[in-house]
Amino acid sequence: MVTIRLSRGGSKKRPFYQIVVADSRSPRDGRFIERVGFFNPLASGNVERVRINLDRVNHWIGHGASLSDRVASLVKEAQKAA
């Protein structure tokens, strides 16, 4: 099953997440099919917090991909801002 979820990057105590399309059996930070955006939880000021390619997310949802809970809330936030 294909899932759209967060993959952690960044350094210790400074998380940065890639929003990726991956097989649900793959490890969290392991192999993925496509990168569709990023999420920076520590963003402040003029720094961009979330960027999501909504066209690609909708494409994968149409092909049966499921969203993780956190990614679903980020997509909803991005759709509201767009």
Curated annotation (Swiss-Prot):
Q: A cellular component term (GO) from this record?
A: cytoplasm
> What terms describe the molecular function in GO for this protein?
structural constituent of ribosome
Example GO biological process term?
Answer: translation
Keyword annotations for this protein, in alphabetical order, are: Ribonucleoprotein, Ribosomal protein
Q: Which residues are connected by disulfide bridges in this protein?
A: none
The membrane-spanning stretches of this chain are: none
**What InterPro entries does UniProt report for this protein, alphabetically?**
Ribosomal_bS16 (IPR000307), Ribosomal_bS16_dom_sf (IPR023803)
The record's annotation in Pfam families points to:
Ribosomal_S16
The family annotation for this protein states:
Belongs to the bacterial ribosomal protein bS16 family.
User: Which HAMAP family does the UniProt entry name for this protein?
Assistant: Ribosomal_bS16 (MF_00385)
**Under what name is this protein listed?**
Small ribosomal subunit protein bS16
Question: Lineage, please?
Answer: Bacteria, Pseudomonadati, Pseudomonadota, Gammaproteobacteria, Pasteurellales
